[in-house]
Amino acid sequence: YEDKVVIVWFWELGTKGTSRVLCVEVPSGKVLWENDAARKYKKYGDDKLVQFYVHYWEDGNDDRDLYAELDVHTGEVYTRRYPGYNANVFATTIYKDYLFYGAEKGDAYVGAIDLRTHEMLDEVMIDFTRGDFNQIASIGVHDGQLYVEIQTELDHSDIHVLDLDEDE
């Protein structure tokens, strides 16, 4: 950001401490706010950081699974759960007003959350040839197309390209 830097840090696994987020004014170095809402955020717009993470559980998702939105001016965090949603979501990207994510639920899916309303849109299944690995490794947007990398083997990935409807 022009006048501030947001720093997210995580303690090393196995050590004692609390992961933190802090906002530092530039160039003074003054700490504007600090909290313990450390997540792997992505920048959205001029004043927000967002994250969507879900880990599949046989009994349904747990308390850590949610959408989180951090206001960079205040440090306040808005969270939202999607009751009944159960998948593995590790890869996300932001494009315009949408957070796109890759979801693993036995098959591979791509979904989106409208960042203005927080509505979860319908997911689309991706047809791919299975291997021994089968995980969504990355997701990104370029020139109006959504690219999804599915790692099917330890040393091989398939790239799937979906056209985005810019009017919807």
Predicted regions and their residues:
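Repeated scaffold domains used in trafficking and secretory/extracellular systems
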Residues: 1-2, 34-48, 52-54, 82-96, ...
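A structural detector for beta-sheet-dominated domains
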Residues: 9-10, 36, 53, 73, ...
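Structural motif
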Residues: 14-22, 58-68, 106-112, 154-163
